[in-house]
Amino acid sequence: MHHSNKEFNFFICEICNLVFLNPRLPLKELEEYYTDIYLPYRGTSAWGKYKKLVSLSQRGLDIKRAKILKQYSFPNKASNILDIGCGNPTFLEICSHFFKSSLYGIDFSDNGWKREQERFKKLNLKVGDIDSLGKKFSPDIITLWHYLEHDYYPNKTLKKLASISNSNTRLYIEVPNYDSLSRKKYNQNWAGFHTPRHTFIFSPKNIEILLNKNGWQVDLIDLKGTLDSYVLSWMSEMEIKGLDWSKSLENQFWNYFYGMVKYKLKHLFTNKSEGVMTIIAKKLEM
């Protein structure tokens, strides 16, 4: 899922089954894979004339995630909500309608919002990493929607987040699940690998170990996740076909739509993880 034919290798830990990219690209070189044509930065505009229809789907996903925050964290006016790897910050935009909290987004590039600064002007968006948040900043809710698999130093990140959190802070993470049905089906073409941007691929066992090691206690692991599992499946199919992700997806819309209907009917009664998982954790009491 990148603009070159370069091959990348993943290895698996025999003890905890953590999958990791080795060798990893130097961070400077990695920037070439996060340009403004990167699909999450392009957002719904990647779908051309079907942008509005896809926007409705994205809005539904953002609302679903906001409702999870409401269910487990009860945000209020005094709450600080931090979205790490915010990309195109539509999730925070939805949170601004749901809650009267202070909303913060951080990403190492502004490619996700620089073209729509007026739209997102009420959000506190920052280019940088978590070390640039400041020692006095304390989030009540932290979300990492498909961020942690990109992080070169997840131990450091989670430990840092625990250090700036309060006793009531809740952490929400969503990542591809290596133990999922779609990974077993597509193997090396699985979109969850997303080389070379994804450096770690987690499963329920090792992500709980990782969180516990760095100051967090897992409350819930939802093996269904919030992202529609069809998205990962469709992207895997497109990987096999060699789709150029930098081009417009307008011509793929109806293929995507009809495929989704068939997928939904086929997987109507599936209870196993089909692609992603959501983890909710709280700060460990010392």
Predicted features along the sequence, with ranges:
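Short, P/G- and charge-enriched loop/turn segments at secondary-structure junctions
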Residues: 263-271
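Conserved N-terminal segment of class I S-adenosyl-L-methionine
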Residues: 1-145, 154-158, 223-224, 243-246, ...
